[in-house]
Amino acid sequence: MNLSLAKNYFGRVFDLFKIKLPGQMGIDKDIKQAKFRNNQNKAMVNIMFTHAWMVDHIKSFVKSENITPQQYNILRILRGAGEPLSTLQLRERMLDKMSDTSRIVERMVSKGLVQKAVSEKDKRMVDVILTPQGAELLENLDRRNEELDAVVNHLSDEELETLNSLLDKLRNNH
């Protein structure tokens, strides 16, 4: 299949992922690697590179509030849940499953962003509760959400839906 047929067949996916046709910048130029083992390898490298790029943006975004991306994630999870959650429940919902949730929560307690209390549902468990200070920090970041949104603002709603569908499909295949 030639490139023009492929572009017609895959439609906006080429544009969505900024797939570069000959003569344009792409992952190969970004990391100065001329050849990849195959398209699957190139896609994996591109996803890893994009992940690192996104993490850098998020680190920069939360730095002003003196928190880490993992702490931001926990604050968002607690606010979204609307109720206290155990550290196990937090770990299950976190974006970074390898995080040491207990240690992160302890740091957040020392900053006054969350509190820990014995669970009312199960006295053997400890619940993590969002404090007013933690909620205020989230509100400060909410007012600046357009900084994060700017990363994908150049994509149309259709492209964002396609991107989300493809990323979901990638994860759900395994």
Name the predicted role of every residue range.
Residues 1-65:
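N-terminal leader segment of winged-helix/HTH proteins
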Residues 48, 76-82, 142, 168:
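Short, locally clustered residues in the helix-turn-helix/winged-helix DNA-binding domain
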Residues 106-164:
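Charged, amphipathic alpha-helical coiled-coil/dimerization segments
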Residues 21-26, 36, 40, 139, ...:
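Inter-domain helical "communication" segments and dimerization helices
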Residues 52, 56-97:
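N-terminal helix-turn-helix DNA-binding core of bacterial DNA-binding proteins
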Residues 161-174:
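Exposed, interaction-prone assembly regions rather than primary DNA-binding/catalytic cores
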